[in-house]
Amino acid sequence: MNIRLLHDRVIVKRKEMESKSAGGIVLTGSAAGKSTRGEVIAVGKGRVLENGNIQPLDVKIGDTIIFNDGYSVKVEKIDNQDVLIMSESDILAIVEE
């Protein structure tokens, strides 16, 4: 499926979070909770300013990000994979490794 994102929209693949219980048992999936980290897999052209110019996004494809998992983040299934669609303003940080 081809998707063309509008404005400052970003598609993110959520990274699975691995954590350990107090007893040292590794928890994965729903037992570990939802991660607020992900990888950017698609970006729009940028935010349209009042003067009509387009401000490019700070994030790019391949970036690992930390995001706000709020009401404005939409979950969609694309090519049988759950992804998140959000505005760049929902992104809190870019993780530099």
From Swiss-Prot:
This is Co-chaperonin GroES. Heptamer of 7 subunits arranged in a ring. Interacts with the chaperonin GroEL. Its main location: cytoplasm. It comes from the Bacteria. Belongs to the GroES chaperonin family. Keywords: Chaperone, Cytoplasm. GO terms for molecular function: ATP binding; metal ion binding; protein folding chaperone; protein-folding chaperone binding; unfolded protein binding. It is found in: Cytoplasm. Gene3D superfamilies: GroES chaperonin (2.30.33.40). Disulfide bonds: none annotated. Together with the chaperonin GroEL, plays an essential role in assisting protein folding. The GroEL-GroES system forms a nano-cage that allows encapsulation of the non-native substrate proteins and provides a physical environment optimized to promote and accelerate protein folding. GroES binds to the apical surface of the GroEL ring, thereby capping the opening of the GroEL channel. GO terms for cellular component: cytoplasm. CDD domains: cpn10 (cd00320). GO terms for biological process: chaperone cofactor-dependent protein refolding.
